[in-house]
UniProtKB/Swiss-Prot annotation:
This is Aspartate carbamoyltransferase catalytic subunit. GO terms for biological process: 'de novo' pyrimidine nucleobase biosynthetic process; 'de novo' UMP biosynthetic process; amino acid metabolic process. It is an enzyme of class 2 (transferase). The keyword Transcription regulation does not apply. The lineage of its organism: Bacteria, Pseudomonadati, Pseudomonadota, Betaproteobacteria, Rhodocyclales.
Amino acid sequence: MYNPQLNKNGELSHLLSVEGLPKAILNQILDTAASFMEVSAREVKKVPLLRGKSVFNLFFENSTRTRTTFEIAAKRLSADVINLDINKSSASKGETLLDTIDNLCAMHANLFVVRHASSGAPYLIAEHLQRVGRDDIHVVNAGDGRHAHPTQGLLDMYTIRHYKKDFTQLRVAIVGDILHSRVARSDIHALTTLGVPEVRAIGPETLLPKHLDKLGVHVFHDMNEGLKDCDVVIMLRLQNERMTGALLPSAGEYFRHYGLTPQKLALAKPDAIVMHPGPMNRGVEIHSAVADGSQAVILPQVTFGIAVRMAVMSIVAGN
């Protein structure tokens, strides 16, 4: 079956979504990321894999962790990194997305890292590059609308593998605003592909997408029930900027029912880890005692994200 992310040899040429990628490619990325962890421990944190290549960061939405870690990752691969200031670019004057891409291609771009509010924007760019015969230029999706955030999903998988080793023995809970979360979608596809036997979605009915059961996900509206005996708890923030209409009574009411407190975390396994893609809203989806506690691996997630993004860019570029 045709997959726009793969070249004619079945190798990863763009990373647009975790969905549809074979398990072997996910493991290739995770294994490559593990090898890059050593680079971050060196005095000189550089490898020459993208020397002479130009990486353009195109962030049409705000970002701290993702944009910064992509920039660090590209520089550690020895790439030349160009951060396009969208507010000062011709895009703010009405230039179309594909016209922007064509102009950057004329500047000898090799790889685009794209975050966009519109679902499917990275696919549009990848298809355009193929149509104009630029198979030598690669696209990495850094988050598109509510659709996907594949590198966040992959760094979450790396974090889980680092602490739990065997995916096939795990019970993983994803808690919060799953309806609007591109991270949740990427995590669910990655977890099921890697063989996690039980993925749980916990949240109010208004914040859970329909048909999660068709993805093999177990749905819980009671957080206490959903957390029982879980090995991994992934907390999500409320995506207020993507909500239309009143989906929640109040932040305080939400915290009472779905905020992760030490008491609720105690229902999971004693060695359960707590993850969060950031930014965190303390006192809304997570209590500070949990966020700063011994079971939280939120800051290691950020560290692992550099190695994972190094792996993704290196692999799509043909290394």
